């Protein structure tokens, strides 16, 4: 029964998304509004791990990460046009190969049976040692799947992808992520080019064109039309501090880089901004959208809106004109009882931008 319902939803949304896409072709990519997923690669925490952690969760943190996603190609088939990926550096390999929680909990499912986490390269997990269930152990495998899907759907509308470079202090198990450096960010760019292909990426250089800076180009609305961006991806770095600055170092206006950065409005590198509180920042987002920036915001966070079936944040996100709205619930949760589901009219996930078009 569940499969039949999903199939009906998929077919109806696919048909509508195709007709909707035609209507968007002559708009620029900053003149549309799309819905996408947050931590798109994430699987649910295994029940036995969740049970063990919940008994020790005095801060009631665990319910905030009680969400999951269908495989990324299925998300794209459904019509989502934004993804979010967390990326851990692992230049020597093996740093995240054995989640420490497995020393405390016996699980029925093996972790990384093909030992992909033991090899050098960028890894995709949510929280080391705890929330480690993922559709992709490596960024390489994820990019290969994105290319495969894109090649099979060459006329797909552009897909926005937020990349969050995860590092920071050691967790309670003592695992300290590898810290990013300019050479590691060079490796990240090369990974995108190698496994997805530069021809499939909308780069800062593409948008800057002949303008003096990327920001000047954005303020002149120098974004491509949807029909000219079909089959492509646009990446944004989800960091507004040290890692952002490291990525941009020696790359003024992000010259030669593959990924946009969350840089302050008015700075040479500023083009795409992350403003996650549409209720608080409604007028600010609307103003930035009108100026030419692309904005990412959120319909929900930490499962709270889904548990209370509260759509007020999503309504403000739509009203704000933010081009990208992320959610954990493009489909209702199967982990707790809720009818909460995010989408536009007729089960679509893409439409004209209400602030910039009529």
What are these regions (language model features)?
Residues 20-85, 89-358:
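Catalytic cores of phosphodiester-bond hydrolases, prominently lipid phosphodiesterases
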């Amino acid at each position: 029964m569940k499969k039949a319902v999903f199939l009906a939803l998929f077919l109806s949304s696919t048909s509508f998304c195709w007709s909707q896409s035609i209507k968007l072709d002559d708009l620029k990519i900053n003149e549309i509004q799309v819905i996408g997923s947050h931590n798109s690669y994430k699987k649910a925490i295994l029940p036995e791990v969740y049970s063990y952690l919940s008994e020790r969760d005095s801060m009631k943190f665990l319910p905030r990460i009680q969400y999951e996603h269908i495989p990324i190609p299925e998300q794209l088939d459904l019509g989502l046009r934004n993804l979010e990926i967390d990326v851990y550096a692992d230049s020597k390999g093996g740093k995240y190969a054995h989640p420490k929680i497995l020393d405390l909990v016996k699980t029925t499912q093996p972790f990384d049976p093909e030992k992909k986490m033991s090899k050098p390269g960028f890894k995709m997990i949510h929280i080391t040692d705890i929330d480690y269930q993922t559709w992709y152990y490596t960024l390489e495998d994820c990019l290969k799947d994105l290319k495969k899907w894109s090649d099979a759907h060459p006329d797909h509308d552009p897909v926005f992808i937020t990349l969050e470079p995860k590092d920071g202090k050691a967790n309670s198990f003592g695992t300290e992520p590898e810290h990013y450096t300019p050479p590691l960010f060079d490796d990240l760019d090369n990974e995108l080019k190698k496994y997805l292909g530069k021809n499939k990426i909308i780069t800062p250089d593409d948008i800057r064109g002949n303008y003096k800076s990327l920001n000047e180009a954005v303020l002149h609305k120098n974004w491509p039309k949807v029909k000219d961006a079909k089959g492509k991806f646009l990446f944004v770095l989800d960091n507004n501090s040290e890692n952002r600055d490291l990525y941009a170092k020696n790359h003024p206006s992000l010259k030669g880089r593959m990924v946009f950065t969350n840089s302050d409005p008015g700075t040479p590198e500023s083009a795409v901004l992350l403003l996650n509180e549409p209720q608080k920042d409604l007028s600010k987002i609307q103003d930035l959208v009108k100026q030419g920036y692309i904005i990412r915001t959120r319909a929900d966070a930490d499962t709270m809106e889904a548990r209370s079936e509260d759509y007020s944040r999503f309504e403000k996100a739509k009203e704000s004109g933010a081009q990208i709205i992320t959610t954990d619930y493009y489909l209702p949760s199967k982990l707790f009882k809720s009818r909460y589901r995010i989408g536009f009219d007729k089960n679509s996930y893409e439409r004209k931008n209400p602030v910039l078009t009529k």
